[in-house]
Amino acid sequence: MPVFPFCRPMTCAGLAAALVAFSVGVQAQPAPADASAQIRYTRYGVPHIVAKDERGLGYGVGYAYAQDNLCLLANEVLTVSGERSRYFGAKGQTLEQRDNLASDLFFTWLNSPAAVDAFLQAQPASVQALLAGYASGYNRALVERRRQGLPAECGDGEWVRPISSQDLVKLTRRLLAEGGVGQFVEALAGAQPPTLARAQSSAGFASALARQERFAAERGSNAVAVGAQRSANGRGLLLANPHFPWMGGMRFYQMQLTIPGQLDVMGAALPGLPVVNIGFNQHLAWTHTVDTSKHFTLYRLQLDPKDPTRYVLDGKSLPMARQTIRVAVKGTDGSLSQIERQVYSSQFGPVVQWPGRLDWDAQAAYSVRDANLENSRVLQQWYQINRADSLAALKGSVEQLQGIPWVNTLAVDQGGRALYLNQSVVPYVDQQLLDTCSNPQAQGRLVVLDGSRSACQWKVDAQAAQPGIFPARLLPSLEREDFVQNSNDPAWMANPAQPLTGYSPLVSRNDQPLGMRGRFALQRLQGKARLGVDELQRMVTDEEVYLASLVLPDLLQWCKGASADVQAVCSSLAAWNGKADLDSGMGLVHFQNLFNALAEHPESWRVAFNPADPQHTPRGLAVEQAAVSRLVHQAALASLKQVSESGVAGAARWGQVQQALDGTPVPGGPQALGVYNAIYSVPHGQGKRLVVSGTSYLQLVSFTDKGPEARGLLAFSQSSEKASAHASDQTKAFAAKQLALIPFTEAQIKADPEYREVVISERDKGAVVSQP
């Protein structure tokens, strides 16, 4: 690495004094040195950022990110600050289709000044410097871009403002809450005692329920870590295929971070984070998949019959805590008013109210306790992973810090070891505590504990990183030299040769069917054949619909005796290639509709799920049974009606139906069908479906004698700004299955045909030095 080239001081107009104030840390300390960064861009606009220290590194990240996604981050900061209603009114909606008012009430509660400052104070100096630098870099870019004219995505720009370290903490806390209390936004914002309860929209809660059910589908992932015994060259090999939203606050950004002699890591990060979440360095490569572990529990409160805002604990009546939340709301005439709500809490957590599911009446109420609200270690955790020089160092860091919020970790090293960790922040509720304290009337997958007894509090272990969570020794861990894999299944079948069992149901279960993607992966990985990058890439790009291999022959057999009114469905199924590729026909659409209907009837399987044979059950469709035959016929008729109403042409190809926002055809399909390249799309106009989530940062890393070699892409491209040259370039490459070399070494970066360099420094007072 060459000596870092700092920019000479420039005599240009300085940043506004207000921006300087925003970049200062919360702790009293000497004024930090001016931040500097060198940003080298390669193909697709990917920044490779070099700095001498963390503040400079954060400065470069914030500046680069704001060149591509200024309005996206500004919008997310507005959301997590609880200020949407101030600018857009109470009835507008967030990207997640939440009413602004409910969102603002929730985030004003979640990100109180005390909670945000406590989180920031808990960070080590290195992380505080990264955050302060990021805010300063973003603010510099904001000044420059406002001078040039803000992107169209910023609208009138009234709501776009400088940011601070505290704003970045708010974004981080929102990410932490995604797997817990963040799924109860409306339920928390609307919770009121029965004597004060207002009429609540059932439609709003129906939307909230739909979002809960979509959580795993929109934030899934595939991962395969191959060790020396199975990799083609006897070294580590990793496939990272996270499935995340294509818009908003969970949209990945590709970048390389370098502090010479200390840090050199390449990968992708979520908005507002100055660290790499999924990536590789000289020694190892890692990725994450959303886990099936529970990260919160509910507590059923026994209320004092004299007062529904008091609850009984161990025979004593205790008052609920009350917190007044105030939100500014813009009226139709442009004037501002203030709305107040009370958030009630027990010692377990905030009270939530979900009509018909979690009712607050005279007898009972429900509190939610989210383990990740006490996780201030998450940024430090990823920064330590970024700097890890061995698989042992990565594993030791995850076990000690326990900062991973709600994902599994899979990794390989250059020596050919493969690692799987289901070690996130999970409430310490074992089977014994469940047997003693759980509510047998609890609905669905929610864990509801008895809130009338202190004995039902989460257990505390001195070796855990925080009170009330499982220590690492009680969480699944597996290290092998053949392979480990995960596609959002429990830890159980990470490698069938060594099943992981015996854990709390809140951690991992082994009594439920594997997902179709997991079964597909295990089928591809079975045997002893050596695996290379091409084999792992084809797992994604083959676009195979695994479920079709299990039931399509039965459907075609049924079609031989089907009535004339469903022959169009049968013809399309017979002509379908069994894939979710751009050229796949309407058979894919009808197959998906049929499966969605039959999924409600598990008795339709010819061979039911058998825990002793999870890789091969359930399978087959019992079409020979009259009841199943009727179900298939009804589903086929419904599919014809649905296709007709959606406006999809009978001869349409999948690439003409499923597209990105700019119209780029997108391959892939529903994860429930076993499509490894999982893509989640929604109806969007006549005969079209818009991709909103799915394959995001796709990374394949192999290790050689010279270090890591990587190929991949960012499926939705670097920039969320329509006018950017990098708004859809990688999306087109994704559609064409053209994964590119990911430049990592100095030679690879400088050899890139689109190489350009930018040098920025706080000393230069706003000037940018660009070198061709």
Curated annotation (Swiss-Prot):
Pfam families found in the cross-reference section: Penicil_amidase (PF01804)
Chief site of localization: periplasm
Chain positions listed as propeptide in the UniProt record: 199-220
Subunit structure: Heterodimer of an alpha subunit and a beta subunit processed from the same precursor.
One Gene Ontology MF term: hydrolase activity, acting on carbon-nitrogen (but not peptide) bonds, in linear amides
Annotated InterPro entries: Ntn_hydrolases_N (IPR029055), Penicillin_amidase_A-knob (IPR043147), Penicillin_amidase_dom1 (IPR023343), Penicillin_amidase_N_B-knob (IPR043146), S45 (IPR002692)
General remark: AHL-mediated signaling mediates quorum sensing in many species of Proteobacteria, regulating hundreds of genes, including many that code for extracellular virulence factors.
Task of the protein: Catalyzes the deacylation of acyl-homoserine lactone (AHL or acyl-HSL), releasing homoserine lactone (HSL) and the corresponding fatty acid. Possesses a specificity for the degradation of long-chain acyl-HSLs (side chains of 11 to 14 carbons in length).
Protein family per UniProt: Belongs to the peptidase S45 family.
Enzyme Commission number, as recorded: 3.5.1.97
Residues annotated as signal peptide: 1-28
Protein name: Acyl-homoserine lactone acylase PvdQ
Compartments reported by the entry: Periplasm
The species this protein was found in: Pseudomonas putida (strain ATCC 47054 / DSM 6125 / CFBP 8728 / NCIMB 11950 / KT2440)
Reactions accelerated catalytically: an N-acyl-L-homoserine lactone + H2O = L-homoserine lactone + a carboxylate
Keyword annotations of the record: Hydrolase, Periplasm, Quorum sensing, Signal, Zymogen
Organism phylogeny: Bacteria, Pseudomonadati, Pseudomonadota, Gammaproteobacteria, Pseudomonadales
Presence of keyword Secreted: no
Active site, per annotation: S221
